[in-house]
């Protein structure tokens, strides 16, 4: 550390962490001082004592003293270790258990393993690779081995013995007793007293000695390591002493110091050690030494771990337990989680938030005081030096200013104190720490950060006052409100971080959330309320207000729409004005129930080309809904436009609402008189019903529903009546409130409130419930002392019949408070529960990432999914779409899809096609069409197998319907004209498209299968939407439109593929954890509905994640075999066959009598039974009379239960007989007797003595018990109760459409899957249980995975949330990927073999680190946690790849360029269309068209329309053209703002500009200087213009007037295949489409991203081009000296040297026009002449 110089070079990163144990030698080698004294200070109490605990060699913690070892001050010296030599070895407390296990594995005399390869099981154990598992296996085998064998039987011949080198001694059984190990030896029988084993404490020396004798081979088998962790190192002989900086003392004044707990503990250890040494030295008695030794052991143990079970805690003088080393590391506040995984950070701010509707969606208002405090270090460059100088002049107190200047030497100048701040001359490369300013990207966050939308990047807007301001719509993802919430802001400190924030985290990019593939932001609050009022049919606005409103639209084009009403005065409808804020080209339609095209209620929604046609805009349209306006705009126009849309809508609507007004008050809750009367009647009626039911129940006339007790049935009825009354009253109130009612307006707009709020405010608050039941009796038999006992009336049990408006009575208020209190407690409990669940999920999935081979893997590289989500799509790019082929009848299907050119029924109407009449009867075409139709039928069959119930709404990429709509709009499809498409175009186009939809690229089988699976569903959708008949008949697309649709689908599909580096694990964990937080803890939705009770909500989620063996409510769902599903009788039969019925469940009473005479009875009721029975006696029974016992067991059965279970007395009696065979004599009454009685007597064997007879009644009691508990009368074990439920199942009818069929389903309590599956009459293929553990055990891991998924899905769906499939699938894949069920707990995923650092950051921190040390683990630091701990960039996201640098090429091609040259180059390369472009020499009088030839108007030549559109080239970029979108433009692939090389000035440099078709013979990349990046492309060369390689104004052969170069010359004719850039039909807006060049039709095979001639990185590369040779060393499109054909211009040629004077772009010898420079010129002229012919 001495004199270290400042360096800006980055430090090396940690590649791996090796764990191990310290050996005593190593401790001594590290140590700088031997510590001998427990004192810290010397006698003077001023200096640290030499050899004491604060020895000056250990490091200084006094800022006045230097460290004696490294001579550094307190700030620089990290501290140095010392050591204590212990008088006796002691156990390391963390390893006592392991030491015990090792002792049990090796011989306690010779140190040899007790078993070796001679033992078969041991051989298997030794073969285990994982050292921890191997150790566990060996220990299991060895711990029972009680002798160290000298020889063992040989394998070949068991009679012969083979020596194994053991010592033959017996082994002790070892017990852990506190901190000691106690051995007990069983003595040999030979030596006598076998009863008394020898007991003694195993001393540490003894164990240390044995461990030293274990051979390397043996301890390696036990999982230790020769170099890093030998077993003897688990026993401490030399203790390292941490340096004082780790245990600093605090000084109160000169003399008094307070020492740290560790120092205190170390002093104890030293004292104990010294006293032990003294005792040994003085030869003290054995027990004294033993005592001193155990004291030392205690101190060393509590120094490391002060929470040892069964050990007293070491206390401070104050009585507070000492904080041990272990306590410093573990837990949330500990070192790992508290200081390494998460730390407090600089450059952050926190304050209260408030709303501001005038900010843009992605802005954040930052108070000026914060903006002046937070800084960003900006590097001084030529471009910003003036600005930064001004900031430095402004200084730290004026915004915008700067706080520090950092020189390139690393020195900081603090501008607060700098005298000469004004005249600091900034130098390039210095840094200025400037204040944050407008539009800086910052990270904004609100805790708890439950999902990735809780941290987003905003743009700064510096504003006055002291709170953060944010747009209202961005509050929902943060879950923020303005009632005092605070939020945090973090300022990025490097350009890379800024780039990541603005390109990855920016708010607009998060609008559509991957959690449920829908937007997570929408219009909220007053804007939402106002937007509904604004778009009502009767909202009209006058001219003055319209003008004001239009001014509020930020990008209004200045055109006032035509008013909707002209006379008597012009009026504009609200819909019109709102439409101005919606971008053009947006289509949206939604039909609510009962919407026609002109719905009287104005419900539904239709937006065409950004104009609202009908429908009131409310939450369904502009809320965060799937397929709403926000979603569509993001998908169609890109995130930036969508973010703008939020602002536009808010500004317009808020302005209107401000002037229109909206307020709500108590009057809005009042319903009119007649309604109130009706409400009162409704409630009275319900109370009367309840009274009737109560009377019925008291008179015992109520029948219990199946599976419920009588009381449950009664409660169920009461609650049902009361809830119905409340809902009915609420509906009355709601219907009565007018549409003008303000509360109702808020509910209808969706901005606040719901139906239930109206009902409770105006009508009736309703039944209060606690734990899902009515209020229970808390006092004796009553709820409150104000009621009489046993009062079950609604008032007494918590029914509140008043509304909030009328006010509650005291009793009602009390019950209401009870219900409310429960809600609060529930919320508090839930927050803790779900927080822990979320943490476990995140830690279990944190390292799962999509890799560059599209697999989803964890940090070990284990494959979790071969392709993410099984389709490789990014969840944010997916939308719910319906697969059309699945529904409808067969006839309708055929009508919609079948085309038969040979048959008049299914032929196409000839008027649809221009070639309509020619194709009828065309057999070749018919073959294509039949193939298409067969495939569609196959799809239909396949989809019906997958989506059994015919519901085929599934989230898929690329909204095809919208692309078709856009095409119809863009190409002005006329539904009356025939199309110029041919059937072949359609069928083959769709076929080619399917082949181009590549998610995975590769030839091997696994990849091919995964690729096929990934696109299967999407291809089904594609084929159904683009079937020939639909394209021609429904959509009426033209050839141009159809091609556009295809290329668009492909581009959007490829854009939807998930990006490698995406951390999908955390995404999945958050997507499941976040809805869990919104879940109610215990869901009582099914309060007493007659069905099985199912755990749901958070408790069920906990069960699933813990893989709980005993669930609260295990249950089976049993379906009947096909054919009998609707048969109720059959269902009853099966119910009784599987419901488990014990004798106990049908018995009312059981009694024991002394009834000595078997032939008669003392019980009068039973005489009939006996007489009846004895009239039918057989011989055997006669004989048994004498042996029958006088004690009688008499059972009375329950007739109702017997009937319910469908049992007869005979069956029960025979079952008892069967169980006890001849030991019991049983008789029973008839089935129709008054009472059902069974009488049993024990039959005694003849040889019974009197003594036994006396105990017979006891024996009978035991028999009675056995009978009632164990006798199963019928059914399957564990199936406690079976409920029959009737469900409707959707099945395809014979005609093909889906119809509902009722079926009976049995729901059970209890599970016994394997048994129930064998019961005849059920459908074993459909049986299901919610216990996925059983499913896995019976049906295997794949079935288990499916069941686990279904359970997770049900928990989340039960709450009404929706989470995309891939997140839950990833979770269940992780849980099942090991082949068993891995729970999301410390016993599950945290036992896997991921890195120790990663595991210790979850739970059991210290134990995991001990284990890692003992087994010498190596952590390769590929996980997230490891890199967070080490403070490194983790290999995820933008850090997931490496960059390879070709160093040779670097040296070769580094041009020496001045800064100005770079500037000019940039200017030209990226600035299209500008005369001032740096690449033009102003002296040249060249026409614009010639300069940038491709810019000729595309629409001019209609017959040859080159653009996709009829718009001229000048329209490029306007909103009307389909190419005007942002980076997400759904147009040609790669064309958009973000496309790197597209610039009209560099046609050869654009992957999307095919007009330079390399296949055209006259084009050859011979122009040495045609590349914007080439240095020779410089304005300093006057003789060069990009249109011709050999252009020189002085050359007579090239002048616009010369006949050989005239746009009309045949060589440039637009129809010629040479397709020159000057040809009028080439337009930059038609990047991939040119009707005349056969080689460039997007559907032609040569235009395919995979075809070799198309590669975006090498625009001029084409194997067919004659002048291209792959062997040319200098060919590289980016190389500054790129020209494959010129031999004299090859960087490898000997005379090439950038520094040589002959190579200078300005030298006259270097002129592209000079003949000497173009060796290929003649050849080229020759080519041109050839072409012109």
Swiss-Prot record:
Recorded superkingdom: Eukaryota
Q: Where is Zn(2+) 1 annotated to bind? A: 67, 70, 77, 80
Query: What does the PTM comment state?
Result: The tandem 7 residues repeats in the C-terminal domain (CTD) can be highly phosphorylated. The phosphorylation activates Pol II. Phosphorylation occurs mainly at residues 'Ser-2' and 'Ser-5' of the heptapeptide repeat. The phosphorylated form of Pol II appears to carry, on average, one phosphate per repeat. The phosphorylation state is believed to result from the balanced action of site-specific CTD kinases and phosphatases, and a 'CTD code' that specifies the position of Pol II within the transcription cycle has been proposed.
Residues annotated with Phosphothreonine modification: 1471
Would you kindly state one Gene Ontology biological process term found in this protein's UniProt entry? transcription initiation at RNA polymerase II promoter
Under catalytic activity, the entry for this protein gives: RNA(n) + a ribonucleoside 5'-triphosphate = RNA(n+1) + diphosphate
What subcellular compartments does it reside in? Nucleus
- Please give the function described in this protein's UniProt entry: DNA-dependent RNA polymerase catalyzes the transcription of DNA into RNA using the four ribonucleoside triphosphates as substrates. Largest and catalytic component of RNA polymerase II which synthesizes mRNA precursors and many functional non-coding RNAs. Forms the polymerase active center together with the second largest subunit. Pol II is the central component of the basal RNA polymerase II transcription machinery. During a transcription cycle, Pol II, general transcription factors and the Mediator complex assemble as the preinitiation complex (PIC) at the promoter.
Instruction: Relate the assembly described in the record.
Output: Component of the RNA polymerase II (Pol II) complex consisting of 12 subunits. Interacts with DEF1; the interaction is direct and serves to bridge RPB1 to the Elongin complex in a DNA-damaged dependent manner. Interacts with the Elongin subunit ELA1. Interacts with the Elongin subunit ELC1. Interacts with ASK10. Interacts with ESS1. Interacts with RTT103. Interacts with SHE2.
Q: Which residues bind Mg(2+) 2?
A: 481, 483
Q: Where is this region: Disordered?
A: 1537-1733
* Cross-link Glycyl lysine isopeptide (Lys-Gly) (interchain with G-Cter in ubiquitin), where in sequence: 695, 1246, 1350
Biased composition (Low complexity) is annotated at 1538-1719
The EC number of this protein is 2.7.7.6
List where Basic and acidic residues composition bias occurs: 1720-1733
Looking at the record, which segments are called Bridging helix? Answer: 810-822
Record: residues binding Zn(2+) 2: 107, 110, 148, 167
Q: What is this protein called?
A: DNA-directed RNA polymerase II subunit RPB1
The protein's UniProt keywords, in alphabetical order, are: DNA-binding, DNA-directed RNA polymerase, Isopeptide bond, Magnesium, Metal-binding, Nucleotidyltransferase, Nucleus, Phosphoprotein, Repeat, Transcription, Transferase, Ubl conjugation, Zinc
Q: Which PROSITE patterns match?
A: RNA_POL_II_REPEAT
Where does the record place its sequence repeats? 1549-1555, 1556-1562, 1563-1569, 1570-1576, 1577-1583, 1584-1590, 1591-1597, 1598-1604, 1605-1611, 1612-1618, 1619-1625, 1626-1632, 1633-1639, 1640-1646, 1647-1653, 1654-1660, 1661-1667, 1668-1674, 1675-1681, 1682-1688, 1689-1695, 1696-1702, 1703-1709, 1710-1716
Q: Where is this region: Lid loop?
A: 248-260
């Amino acid at each position: 550390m001495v004199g270290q110089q400042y360096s800006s070079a980055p430090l090396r990163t940690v590649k791996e962490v090796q764990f191990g144990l310290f050996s005593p030698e190593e401790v001594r080698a590290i140590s700088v001082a031997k510590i001998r004294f427990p004192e810290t200070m010397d006698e003077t109490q001023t200096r640290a004592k030499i050899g004491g605990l604060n020895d000056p060699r250990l490091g200084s913690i006094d800022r006045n003293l230097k460290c004696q070892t490294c001579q550094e001050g307190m700030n620089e010296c990290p501290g140095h270790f010392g050591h204590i030599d212990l008088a006796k070895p002691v156990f390391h407390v963390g390893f006592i258990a392991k030491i015990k296990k090792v002792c049990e594995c090796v011989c306690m005399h010779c140190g040899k393993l007790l078993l070796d390869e001679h033992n078969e099981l041991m051989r298997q154990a030794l073969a285990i690779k994982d050292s921890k598992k191997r150790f566990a296996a060996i220990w299991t085998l060895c711990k029972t081995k009680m002798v160290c064998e000298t020889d063992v039987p040989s394998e070949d011949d068991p009679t012969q013995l083979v020596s194994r080198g053991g010592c033959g001694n017996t082994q002790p059984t070892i017990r852990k007793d506190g901190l000691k190990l106690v051995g007990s030896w069983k003595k040999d029988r030979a030596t006598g007293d076998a009863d008394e084993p020898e007991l003694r404490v195993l001393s540490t020396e003894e164990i240390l000695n044995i461990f030293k004798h274990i051979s390397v081979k043996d301890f390696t088998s036990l999982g230790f390591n020769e170099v890093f962790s030998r077993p003897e190192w688990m026993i401490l002989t030399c203790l390292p002493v941490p340096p004082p900086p780790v245990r600093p003392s605090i000084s109160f004044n000169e003399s008094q110091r307070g020492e740290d707990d560790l120092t205190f503990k170390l002093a104890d250890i030293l004292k104990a050690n010294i006293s032990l040494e003294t005792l040994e030295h003085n030869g003290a008695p054995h027990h004294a030494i033993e005592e001193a030794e155990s004291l030392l052991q205690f101190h060393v143990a509590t120094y490391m771990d002060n929470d040892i079970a069964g050990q007293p805690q070491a206390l401070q003088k104050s009585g507070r337990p000492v904080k041990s080393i272990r306590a410093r590391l573990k837990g949330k506040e500990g070192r790992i989680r508290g200081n390494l995984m998460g730390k407090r950070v600089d450059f952050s701010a926190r304050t209260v938030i408030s709303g501001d509707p005038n900010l843009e969606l992605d802005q954040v208002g930052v108070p000026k005081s914060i903006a002046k405090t937070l800084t960003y270090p900006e590097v001084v460059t030529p471009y910003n030096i003036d600005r930064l100088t001004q900031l430095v002049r402004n200084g730290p107190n004026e915004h915008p200013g700067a706080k520090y200047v950092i020189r390139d030497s690393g020195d900081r100048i603090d501008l607060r104190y700098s005298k000469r701040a004004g005249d600091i001359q900034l130098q390039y490369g210095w840094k200025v720490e400037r204040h944050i300013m407008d539009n800086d990207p910052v990270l904004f966050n609100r805790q708890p950060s439950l999902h990735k939308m809780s941290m987003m990047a905003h743009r700064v807007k510096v504003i006055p006052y002291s709170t953060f301001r944010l747009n209202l719509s961005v509050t929902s993802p943060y879950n923020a409100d303005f009632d005092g919430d605070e939020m945090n802001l973090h300022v990025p400190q490097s350009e890379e971080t800024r780039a990541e924030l603005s390109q990855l985290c920016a708010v607009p990019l998060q609008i559509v959330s991957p959690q449920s593939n829908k937007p997570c932001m929408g219009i909220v609050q007053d804007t939402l309320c106002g937007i509904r009022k604004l778009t009502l049919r009767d909202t009209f606005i006058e001219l003055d207000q319209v003008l004001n409103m239009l001014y509020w639209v930020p990008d209004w084009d200045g055109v006032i729409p035509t008013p909707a009403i002209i006379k008597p005065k012009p009026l504009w409808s609200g819909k019109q004005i709102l439409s101005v804020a919606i971008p053009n080209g947006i289509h949206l339609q939604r039909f609510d129930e009962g919407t026609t095209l002109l719905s009287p209620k104005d419900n539904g929604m239709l937006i065409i080309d950004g104009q609202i046609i009908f429908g009131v805009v409310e939450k369904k349209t502009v809320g965060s809904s799937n397929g709403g306006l926000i979603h569509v705009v993001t998908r169609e126009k890109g995130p930036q436009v969508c973010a703008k849309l939020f602002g536009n809508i808010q500004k317009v609507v808020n302005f209107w609402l401000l002037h229109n007004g909206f307020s709500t008050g108590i009057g809005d809750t009042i319903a009119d008189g007649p309604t109130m009367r009706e409400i009162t009647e409704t409630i009275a009626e319900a109370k009367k019903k309840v009274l009737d039911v109560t009377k019925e129940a008291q008179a015992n006339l109520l029948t219990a529903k199946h599976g419920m007790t009588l009381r449950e049935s009664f409660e169920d009825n009461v609650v049902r009546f009361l809830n119905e009354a409340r809902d009915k009253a609420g509906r009355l109130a709601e219907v009565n409130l007018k549409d003008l009612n303000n509360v109702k307006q808020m509910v209808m707009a969706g901005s606040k409130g719901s139906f239930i709020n109206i009902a409770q405010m105006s009508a009736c608050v309703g039944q209060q419930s606690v734990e899902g039941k009515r209020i229970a009796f808390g006092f004796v038999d009553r709820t409150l002392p104000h009621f009489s006992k046993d009062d079950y009336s609604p008032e007494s049990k918590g029914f509140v019949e008043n509304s909030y408006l009328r006010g509650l009575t005291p009793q009602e208020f009390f019950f209401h408070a009870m219900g409310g209190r429960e809600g609060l407690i529930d919320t508090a409990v839930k927050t803790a529960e779900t927080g822990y669940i979320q943490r476990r999920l995140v830690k279990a999935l944190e390292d799962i990432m999509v890799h560059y081979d599209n697999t989803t893997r964890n940090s070990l590289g284990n494959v979790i999914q071969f392709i993410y989500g099984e389709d490789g799509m990014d969840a944010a790019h997916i939308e719910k779409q319906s697969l059309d082929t699945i529904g409808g009848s067969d006839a309708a299907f055929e009508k919609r899809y079948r085309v038969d050119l040979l048959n008049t029924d299914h032929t196409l109407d000839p008027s649809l096609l221009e070639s309509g009449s020619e194709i009828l009867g065309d057999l070749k075409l018919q073959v294509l069409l039949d193939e298409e139709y067969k495939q569609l039928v196959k799809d239909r069959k396949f989809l019906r197998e997958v989506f059994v119930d015919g519901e085929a709404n599934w989230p898929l990429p690329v909204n095809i319907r919208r692309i078709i709509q856009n095409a119809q709009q863009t190409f002005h499809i006329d539904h009356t004209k025939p199309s110029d498409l041919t059937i072949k175009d359609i069928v083959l186009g769709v076929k080619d498209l399917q082949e181009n939809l590549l998610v995975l690229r590769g030839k091997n089988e696994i990849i091919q299968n995964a690729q096929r699976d990934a696109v299967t569903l999407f291809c089904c959708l594609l084929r159904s939407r683009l079937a020939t008949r639909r394209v021609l008949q429904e959509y009426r697309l033209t050839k141009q439109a159809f091609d556009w649709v295809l290329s668009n689908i492909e581009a959007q599909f490829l854009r939807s593929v998930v990006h490698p580096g995406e951390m999908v694990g955390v995404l999945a964990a958050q997507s499941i954890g976040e809805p869990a937080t919104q879940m109610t803890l215990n869901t009582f939705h099914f309060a007493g509905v007659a069905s099985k009770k199912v755990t749901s909500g958070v408790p069920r989620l906990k069960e699933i994640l813990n893989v709980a063996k005993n669930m609260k409510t295990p249950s089976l769902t049993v379906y009947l075999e096909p054919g009998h599903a609707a048969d109720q009788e059959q269902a009853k039969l099966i119910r009784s066959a599987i419901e488990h019925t014990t004798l106990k469940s049908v018995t009312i009473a059981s009694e024991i009598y002394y009834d000595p005479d078997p032939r008669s009875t003392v019980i009068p009721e039973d005489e009939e039974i006996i007489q009846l029975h004895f009239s039918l006696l057989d011989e055997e029974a006669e004989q048994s009379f004498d042996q029958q016992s006088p004690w009688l067991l008499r059972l009375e059965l329950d007739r109702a239960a017997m009937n319910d279970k469908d049992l007869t007395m005979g069956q029960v009696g025979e079952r008892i007989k069967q169980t006890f065979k001849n030991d019991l004599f049983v008789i029973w009454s008839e089935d129709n007797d008054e009472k059902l009685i069974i009488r049993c007597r024990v039959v005694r064997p003849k040889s019974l003595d009197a003594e036994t007879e006396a105990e017979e009644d006891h024996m009978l009691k035991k028999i009675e018990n056995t009978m009632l508990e164990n006798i199963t009368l019928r059914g399957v074990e564990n199936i406690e109760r079976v409920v029959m439920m009737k469900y409707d199942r959707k099945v395809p009818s014979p005609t093909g459409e889906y119809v509902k069929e009722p079926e009976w389903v049995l729901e059970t309590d209890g599970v016994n899957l394997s048994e129930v599956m064998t019961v005849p009459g059920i459908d074993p293929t459909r049986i299901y249980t919610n216990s996925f553990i059983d499913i896995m055990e019976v049906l295997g891991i794949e079935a288990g995975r499916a069941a686990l998924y279904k359970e997770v899905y049900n928990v989340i769906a039960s709450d009404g949330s929706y989470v995309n499939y891939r997140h839950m699938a990833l979770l269940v894949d992780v849980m099942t990927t090991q082949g068993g069920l891995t729970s999301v707990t410390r016993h599950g995923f945290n036992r896997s073999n991921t890195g120790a650092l990663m595991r210790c950051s979850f739970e059991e921190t210290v134990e995991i680190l001990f284990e890692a040390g003992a087994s010498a683990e190596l952590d390769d630091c590929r996980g997230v946690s490891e890199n967070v701990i080490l403070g490194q960039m983790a290999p995820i996201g933008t850090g997931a790849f490496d960059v390879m640098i070709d160093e040779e090429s670097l040296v070769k091609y580094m041009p020496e360029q001045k800064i100005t040259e770079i500037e000019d180059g940039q200017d030209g390369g990226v600035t299209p269309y500008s005369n001032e472009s740096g690449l033009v020499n102003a002296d040249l009088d060249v026409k614009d068209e010639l300069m940038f030839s491709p810019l000729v108007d595309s629409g001019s030549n209609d017959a040859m329309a080159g653009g996709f559109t009829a718009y001229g080239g000048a329209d490029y970029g306007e909103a009307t053209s389909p190419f005007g979108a942002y980076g997400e433009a759904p147009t040609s692939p790669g064309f958009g703002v973000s496309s790197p090389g597209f610039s009209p000035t560099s046609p050869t440099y654009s992957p999307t500009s095919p007009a330079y078709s390399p296949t055209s013979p006259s084009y050859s990349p011979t122009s040495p200087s045609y590349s914007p990046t080439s240095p020779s492309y410089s304005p300093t060369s006057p003789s060069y213009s990009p249109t011709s390689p050999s252009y020189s104004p002085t050359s007579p052969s090239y002048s616009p007037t010369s006949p050989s170069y005239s746009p009309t010359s045949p060589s440039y004719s637009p129809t010629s295949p040479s397709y020159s850039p000057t040809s009028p039909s080439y337009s930059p807006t038609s990047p991939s489409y040119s009707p005349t060049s056969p080689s460039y039709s997007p559907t032609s095979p040569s235009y395919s991203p995979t075809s070799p001639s198309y590669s975006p990185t090498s625009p001029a590369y084409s194997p067919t081009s004659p002048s291209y040779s792959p062997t040319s060393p200098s060919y590289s499109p980016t190389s500054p000296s790129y020209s494959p054909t010129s031999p004299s211009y090859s960087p490898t040629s000997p005379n090439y040297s950038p520094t040589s004077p002959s190579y200078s772009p300005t030298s006259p010898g270097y002129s592209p026009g000079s003949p000497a420079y173009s060796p290929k010129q003649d050849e080229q002229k020759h080519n041109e002449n050839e072409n012109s012919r």
